[in-house]
Amino acid sequence: GKAFDDGAFTGIREINLSINKETAIGD
């Protein structure tokens, strides 16, 4: 089954996107 409900998954995805953007800018 899903490890997270939709709300938690969306929150984590948004955090990951933010980290990815910061990493890209840092590079």
UniProtKB/Swiss-Prot annotation:
One of its GO terms (molecular function) is carbohydrate binding. Keywords: Glycoprotein, IgA-binding protein, Lectin. InterPro entries: Jacalin-like_lectin_dom. Residues 1-27 form the Jacalin-type lectin domain. Coiled coil: none annotated. N-glycosylated. Belongs to the jacalin lectin family. Tetramer of four alpha chains associated with two or four beta chains. D-galactose-specific lectin, binds the T-antigen structure Gal-beta1,3-GalNAc (Thomsen-Friedenreich-antigen-specific lectin). Potent and selective stimulant of distinct T- and B-cell functions. Shows a unique ability to specifically recognize IgA-1 from human serum. This is Agglutinin alpha chain. It comes from Artocarpus tonkinensis. The lineage of its organism: Eukaryota, Viridiplantae, Streptophyta, Embryophyta, Tracheophyta.
